[in-house]
Amino acid sequence: MDYSYLNSYDSCVAAMEASAYGDFGACSQPGGFQYSPLRPAFPAAGPPCPALGSSNCALGALRDHQPAPYSAVPYKFFPEPSGLHEKRKQRRIRTTFTSAQLKELERVFAETHYPDIYTREELALKIDLTEARVQVWFQNRRAKFRKQERAATAKGAAGATGAKKGEARCSSEDDDSKESTCSHTPDSTASLPPPPPAPSLASPLLSPSPLPAALGSGPGPQPLKGALWAGVAGGGGGGPGTGAAELLKAWQPAEPGPGPFSGVLSSFHRKPGPALKTNLF
């Protein structure tokens, strides 16, 4: 074999420095080297170059034999995150129970809320379900039962509280109604009309002139006026009651007739003593 080209290293380096990567046209390879990542790692060699005496041809051959990066990496080498999302989106199909299955499940649940494995397997074979589905149904049914119990307890407590509040409100209303009834009940004494004031005889009896003028229409003992007033002033020889009685008898007309003070004189004639005593003295 010919190893003479090994001694031409110095000349090749000198030629490379002189050309400064100038022209690769001297090489028998196709003109213009183009890099492509899809090129095979070891492309087929072109026509053989002459011995490495030519520096341009040797440099082109070295660059042509470099492997392309990622040329052997297959497409979609790394897994995409969409695959994980697809797995997460997979959901179990919801089990639909028939009326016969629900009837059997409710019957067993009424007997026990926590059936053992044997009871669940027997029930699953009977209603054509898996034991896992039966177990999940009992778990959901127990949760629903507890929720119903809590709701019933809360409703009962609310009803008891409302009843207590209603009783307290009724008692307060009863008290208020009693107070209002007592306050608005009319008093028996207040409902009665006030008694008429007792007529005072001091002014008509002690004044000598107005009384005869008022009684002038009817007959009266006019000649005895001075004697009667003198008897009243002096006591009439007896007590004050005797003088008052004599006065009334003297002033009473001989024949009954209508007069303005006939009713008053008749009432005082029935009760002559205390009233005249209080009014006159």
From Swiss-Prot:
* Chain residues forming the annotated DNA-binding region: 90-149
- In which residue ranges is the amino acid composition biased (Low complexity)? 153-163, 200-216
Query: What Gene3D superfamilies does the database record attribute to this sequence?
Result: Homeodomain-like
Chief location of this protein? nucleus
CDD domains xref list: homeodomain (cd00086)
**Residue segments, region Disordered:** 145-219
> Which named protein is this?
Paired mesoderm homeobox protein 2A
The organism of origin for this protein = Rattus norvegicus (Rat)
